[in-house]
Each structure stands twice: as structure tokens, then as C-alpha cells.
Amino acid sequence: MAIPEEFDILVLGGGSSGSCIAGRLANLDHSLKVGLIEAGENNLNNPWVYLPGIYPRNMKLDSKTASFYTSNPSPHLNGRRAIVPCANILGGGSSINFMMYTRGSASDYDDFEAEGWKTKDLLPLMKKTETYQRACNNPEIHGFEGPIKVSFGNYTYPVCQDFLRATESQGIPYVDDLEDLVTAHGAEHWLKWINRDTGRRSDSAHAFVHSTMRNHDNLYLICNTKVDKIIVEDGRAAAVRTVPSKPLNAKKPTHKVYRARKQIVLSCGTISSPLVLQRSGFGDPIKLRAAGVKPLVNLPGVGRNFQDHYCFFSPYRIKPQYESFDDFVRGDANIQKKVFDQWYANGTGPLATNGIEAGVKIRPTPEELSQMDESFQEGYREYFEDKPDKPVMHYSIIAGFFGDHTKIPPGKYMTMFHFLEYPFSRGSIHITSPDPYATPDFDPGFMNDERDMAPMVWSYKKSRETARKMDHFAGEVTSHHPLFPYSSEARAYEMDLETSNAYGGPLNLTAGLAHGSWTQPLKKPAGRNEGHVTSNQVELHPDIEYDEEDDKAIENYIREHTETTWHCLGTCSIGPREGSKIVKWGGVLDHRSNVYGVKGLKVGDLSVCPDNVGCNTYTTALLIGEKTATLVGEDLGYTGEALDMTVPQFKLGTYEKTGLARF
């Protein structure tokens, strides 16, 4: 299909939000020409996308499906430079993310303080997006006819129930639906963005773009194309200038211009959307001139208010009789053949899950809060106390070692994956040149507010006790835990001798061999009390008592290991142009997502969020996509059923297969 040079609507960026926006608007009126420009490659029927269980591959440093942005050095990370990846493929994060179905809290959207963005306004759009493929007792808050599928996947590792028993013994109650918009403290069997009927990942591009292009001819897809700048004519966004995603000729860049008759929607993501605006002349005039760009609209908030969820991992050894995904991701050919054969036979087995089977959202008890430093206690009172639907931390269990398996010995593992839901820290990103390929000035602000440390330390202690109460537990991976003093009761321990011998087998001559005393095996746990009916009543290892020196070790570990959760947002915030309590540097968009100071230009991606959301952000990205498409439709004069913008269902067997030669 030939690509025209002029469209009615241009959507710049085919990520989770952009794919939704383009697909919906192409189904608003099939006489509208909609263009979708994406920097990454097409994801159509790409096995590295649709096979859920191989998602870690997309996060390797040589990944072709992600771009990696390196920050400035930070004293809050012990001098480290943070690496923040962003998806670089059609579908954006929905093509390569962890597939965790998590909703924000009702107060999250109310806190946007923007007309039309209250949770009561947005709930119909949340329901419109999803097909909830599990039994539930609250159908009034879920959708059952949407293009994106939600299920438990078609496989569950045994670690799920072990984790839930352990968290219950800690006073974290099991909740049937932790994503009900109001529950902020509980544990659940975690749902996934996986289609139960097929075992495939449920990504935004297949759901909205490919399904539409198969059935209608008014949606045009332009991949491997980077947005350089937006061209403004007579106060209106009229066109966009693009370049190839990778420079073909550094001395003579190849530009191409596409025009839009009615609307341009910028959806390049939290990192790239502000950079596009800045190259187009929108931003802080002082910073724009310093970068060699003529200011067009004075909007100091562009690129400010950068937020993320701060993540760290703590891995543990598990007993050899339990199941994990370690042998599969390590490259055991026999295991891989068995797993792939099962999935291709019927869409089930370990490939039909992400291995993240259960997790918690938690708030501290009054006693736990009293033990945290005063700065966080004050922050808690200001931000959390009157919003009981907001969790402070999340952690979940991964059925294997999440990391580079060439760096650890063979064996079986489990990993605790934590993230801070509402950091107080803020960062920024700005262009350094008009060149679209230039490296930006990037300070993500990780941990630059002291109030963020206490809940991170608390969650490490909390999840460690969860691990120690699990039947799977066989010791810490000591290289990936805080370096506690040798004499501390909190120090990490290797596998116990019995487990080492079980892994080694009768012919192994060195299992349990110790070099001096710099590593120690796990102390033998207390025996089971057979008088108890359920194992979650049995405390196998006593709770650890941490002293001040131990806390410093945890803090240092967090500074050295905290990283992005791929959940960044906020750099093109909705808010008053003059600023507000939550948008201190000034809003970039009005409540209808219009960029201040220009006509015909909206932003529709996670960068619009003025404040954080307590969830894995794919849910919010889809919600923003749905909201933006509705706003555009309304602005164009459509009403009633036309705004349903129903997309066709994606069906297998009706599309060409794409090769993997470039991967």
C-alpha cells in the first residue's frame, strides 16, 4: 500500500498508547486517513514478541527491540550512571514488557486535578480496553469485550502458592482482585497481559493496528522512521519532519515531511516526546537557545517532572525438587525444545507465562512506619495518610534468577522484584542539539529525595522474610544482597550443606567445600510442627533483627543497584500552564491534552501524567490512548456510537509471517 504524504490525522509513535490511538481513530470514520509513524521495526507475528516466556531477551544490552538511554552520573547512586531502556519496536512496551496486569488506584487519576480525568470518567475506558478472561465477583469494574486480553496465562509455577502462603503468614492478606482500584494492601495470584485462548502476549499493536489494517485501508504504517520535529504554520501544527531511525549519511541527513489536515498526536513516549517538542521550539527558552533551537512557545515544563518506579532485585537459591525457568533461559537445548514444542502444540506450558506468578501491594503498619526515618514519616502523612488506596511498595516473586545466567552457577533460583510506587524524587531530560540523533542531557533523578530510601529498605526486609518463610527457600545469592558485617545476624547465607549435596549428587567431590569462613551455609531451619494443619502457620526461620549498621548496608546496596522499572512518565504533564503543587515547573498540556500555545497538537502517552500511578504502567498507557482517541474524536465533531471506535478482533492465520533475520 503506497504511503501518502498527507493525512487527516498523524500519530507520532506506535507504542502502547500510540497504537491504541491510531487504531481507534482509523475506526472512528473509515474515510479518515490516519498515519502512524514508528521508530522501531514492525512487530507483526514476531515470535520474540508474541511468545510470553522469552521476554527477558528483549532486555539484553544488544537488544534490537529496545533503545538504552544513559543518564548523567549521580551521587544518589554512588556515582553510577543509570541506564533507562525504552521500547524500540511497534507496540512499544506492550511488545516487550513484563506483561504484569496492574491497575492504578482511584486517587491516582483524581490527583491529576484535570477535568475529565477523574477515575469515574475513566473507568468506562478501562473496561473498554480489556477482555477479562477469569471468573470474578466484581464485573462492574472490568471489561469483557475489549481487544486486550487479561488472564493468568496458560501455566503457573508452584512458587505462586508458596509465596501466597508466606505473605499471609506475615499479615499480608490474600485478595482475589488486588486491581479493584481501592485495595492497597494485599497479595494476589498475579494476572498477565496474555491471551488465555492462544497463549500469546496481548500487545497493543496486534490488538489495534494489525487488526485494523487487515480489515480497512485507511490506516498507514510507517516503521523505522524517527520523528525529528513538528512544523508549525500560522500557529497550527501542520506537518512533521522525519529522519531514518538510524542515520544513513551523517553528513547529509535524509529528511521527509508528512502533513496533517486535522490533527497531530505526539506519542513518542516519556523520553522522546519532550525531545521532539524541544526540537520543535517548545520548552524553556534559555535551554532551547543553549541547544541551538529558536524558541517558539515558552513552556518550561517540557522535559521536567520526570518520574519512574525505582526497582531492585534480590535473588535466592531454591531446593532442587522445585521448578524454575532457569534451565530454559540458560540455554539447555533439551529443555528449550520441550518447552517450545508444548507451546506450539497447544499454547500452554512455561512459554505461556512470564514466571511472575504472585505479588503484593503493601503499606506500612503504624509500628513499621514509626521505625522509619522522620523525613519519610512526614512524607507519608502528606501524601499517603488520607489516600488509603495508595500502596507504598510492590514486590513480586519471579520463578527463576532474573539476570545474566552466565554470571551465576547453574541451579534453580527465585527472585524478589521490588519497586517503589510513588517516589518523591523528580528528574528531567533536555536536548543538547537540534540533531535528532544527539544524546540528551538526562537526569532521571533516581533517589534524589531522601524520603525514598526508607520504604525501599523496608521492602527489602519484608520480602526477605517472605522468602525465608517459603518452602522453596534454600539461601541467598550472597553476591546479589547487601554486604552486611560478617558478625551481623542479618548477613546473607549460601545454601545449606544438605541442599548443596542434593544439587551436587553422589559423584560431586566439592559440594559443601568451604574456603575459610568468608561464606557460610544457611543455618538449619526449625523442624515442621506436624500439629499445624497449614504450612503458612510454621515459621521455619526466625525473623531477622536489623541494627543501624545493617540498615546502612541495605541503603548502600540500594544506591548501587536501584534501576528503572521501565515505568517513566510525567515529562509533558497535564496541568495549569503557570504550574501547580504537583506540576511545579508549569503544565505542558491542558485538560484535553492540547499543547499550550499551538493548535492541532496533542500529546497522548505516559508523559502526560502529572503525578505517578501505583501500577505497572501498560494499563495506564492504554487508558491514555483510549482517552486521547476520544478527545480527538470529540474535537472533530463526532458523538454517540461513533466514539466507540470498535476495532476488529485480531485473528491468527490471516497475516504474513515476519522473518527474524534482523534479530
From Swiss-Prot:
InterPro entries: FAD/NAD-bd_sf, GMC_OxRdtase, GMC_OxRdtase_N, GMC_OxRtase_C. GO terms for molecular function: alcohol oxidase activity; flavin adenine dinucleotide binding. GO terms for cellular component: peroxisomal matrix. It is an enzyme of class 1 (oxidoreductase). The lineage of its organism: Eukaryota, Fungi, Dikarya, Ascomycota, Saccharomycotina. FAD binds at residues 8-38. This is Alcohol oxidase 2. It catalyses: a primary alcohol + O2 = an aldehyde + H2O2. The gene is AOX2. It is found in: Peroxisome matrix. SUPFAM superfamilies: FAD-linked reductases, C-terminal domain, FAD/NAD(P)-binding domain. Its main location: other. It comes from the Eukaryota. GO terms for biological process: methane catabolic process; methanol metabolic process. Pathway: Energy metabolism; methane degradation. Induction: Induced by methanol. Subject to strong carbon catabolite repression. Its EC number is 1.1.3.13. The C-terminal peroxisomal targeting signal (PTS) is essential for the efficient targeting and import of AOX into peroxisomes via the PTS1 pathway. Minor isoform of alcohol oxidase, which catalyzes the oxidation of methanol to formaldehyde and hydrogen peroxide, the first step in the methanol utilization pathway of methylotrophic yeasts. Belongs to the GMC oxidoreductase family. A motif (Microbody targeting signal) lies at residues 661-663.
